């Protein structure tokens, strides 16, 4: 079991999402107001960092056993912390953190997503 979140770049995640490999579950930990500005273009699970608790996260991911998770925020810091917290609380056994968050995704993959 990994003891820290793995890093994944926007390029690597885009490649993963466009491959034949099963898509990861994308977790976006930004707040509602941030989603209104810039939303991730693929299906994602919204777990706002301000609402996170062990019970809340368990109920949201309970039927995702064996799945791979990628977490994102605006720049990659809150998502890294969420990933570490998820590992520390044994909610997941493995999790990837999107480096540079939605900002990196907008910069490198989809320039139509507003930057803020």
Where are these regions (language model features)?
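Short, surface-exposed ligand- or partner-binding patches at beta-edge/loop junctions that are enriched
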Residues: 72
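Rhodanese-like catalytic fold shared by cysteine-dependent sulfurtransferases
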Residues: 1-24, 32-68, 77-116
């Amino acid at each position: 079991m990994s003891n820290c979140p793995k890093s994944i770049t926007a390029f690597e995640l885009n490649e993963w999402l466009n491959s034949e490999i099963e898509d990861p579950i994308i977790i976006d930990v930004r707040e509602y107001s941030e989603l209104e500005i810039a939303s991730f273009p693929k299906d994602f699970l919204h777990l706002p960092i301000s609402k996170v608790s062990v019970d809340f996260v368990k109920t949201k991911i309970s039927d995702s056993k064996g799945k791979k998770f990628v977490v994102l925020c605006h720049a990659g810091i809150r998502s890294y912390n969420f990933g570490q917290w998820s590992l520390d609380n044994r909610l997941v056994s493995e999790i990837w953190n999107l480096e540079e968050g939605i900002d990196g995704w907008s910069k490198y993959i989809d320039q139509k997503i507003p930057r803020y």
